[in-house]
């Protein structure tokens, strides 16, 4: 079975995270997800994330700590999804590949119809965040 490596960005600003709505003509249309995409053979996960966020959102991202990985089978392929925290970026967000973008708290994000693969990543991020010492 083919394995596909995918990276996802949990972009955080002022305590809120960014969700992106999948386009109407896509697989899992209308569901909300973390921006990201496939890792090319010649790049690291961090490099892939910076490239994907530039392509999808028009931003230059600062990739922070690794959050979690999740694996699931989709259409006869194994998708290995890796989430990274993005605590900072430069540029103005633009939805190049998504229907809509929304900022919300991680708790509010659970109320959105999320892409199933992103739910365990959000939960892992919330657990990490809860364990962080207060500034």
From Swiss-Prot:
It is an enzyme of class 3 (hydrolase). Changing residue 56 to A/D/Q: Abolishes enzyme activity. Its EC number is 3.6.1.65. Divalent metal ions. Mg(2+) or Mn(2+). Its cofactor is Mg(2+); Mn(2+). Changing residue 118 to E: Increases the activity with 2-hydroxy-ATP. Strongly decreases activity with 8-hydroxy-ATP. Changing residue 55 to D/Q: Abolishes enzyme activity with dCTP and reduces enzyme activity with 5-methyl-dCTP. PROSITE patterns: NUDIX, NUDIX_BOX. Changing residue 118 to A/N: Abolishes enzyme activity with 2-hydroxy-ATP. No effect on activity with dCTP, 5-methyl-dCTP and 8-hydroxy-ATP. Changing residue 51 to A: Abolishes enzyme activity with dCTP. Nearly abolishes enzyme activity with 5-methyl-dCTP. Residues 2-127 form the Nudix hydrolase domain. Changing residue 33 to D: Decreases enzyme activity with 2-hydroxy-ATP, dCTP, 5-dmethyl-CTP and 8-hydroxy-ATP. One of its GO terms (biological process) is DNA repair. Keywords: Hydrolase, Magnesium, Manganese. Optimum pH is 8.5-9. InterPro entries: MutT-like (IPR047127), Nudix_hydrolase (IPR020476), NUDIX_hydrolase-like_dom_sf (IPR015797), NUDIX_hydrolase_CS (IPR020084), NUDIX_hydrolase_dom (IPR000086). Substrate binds at residues 34-39, 72, 118. GO terms for molecular function: 8-oxo-7,8-dihydrodeoxyguanosine triphosphate pyrophosphatase activity; 8-oxo-7,8-dihydroguanosine triphosphate pyrophosphatase activity; 8-oxo-dGDP phosphatase activity; 8-oxo-GDP phosphatase activity; dCTP diphosphatase activity; hydrolase activity. A motif (Nudix box) lies at residues 37-58. Pfam families: NUDIX. Transmembrane segments: none annotated. It comes from the Bacteria. Changing residue 38 to A/R: Strongly reduces enzyme activity with dCTP, and to a lesser degree with 5-methyl-dCTP. Monomer. Belongs to the Nudix hydrolase family. This is CTP pyrophosphohydrolase. The lineage of its organism: Bacteria, Pseudomonadati, Pseudomonadota, Gammaproteobacteria, Enterobacterales.
């Amino acid at each position: 079975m083919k394995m596909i490596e995918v990276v996802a960005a949990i972009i955080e600003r002022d305590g809120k995270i960014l969700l992106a709505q999948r386009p109407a003509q896509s697989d899992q249309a209308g569901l909300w997800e973390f921006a990201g995409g496939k890792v090319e053979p010649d790049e690291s996960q961090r490099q892939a994330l910076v490239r994907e966020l530039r392509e999808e959102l028009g931003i230059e991202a600062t990739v922070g700590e690794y959050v979690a990985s999740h694996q699931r089978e989709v259409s006869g392929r194994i998708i290995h999804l890796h989430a990274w925290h993005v605590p900072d970026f430069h540029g103005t967000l633009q939805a190049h590949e998504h229907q809509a973008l929304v900022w919300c708290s991680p708790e509010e994000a659970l109320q959105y119809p999320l892409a199933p693969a992103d739910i365990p990543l959000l939960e892992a991020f919330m657990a990490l965040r809860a364990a962080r010492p207060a500034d």
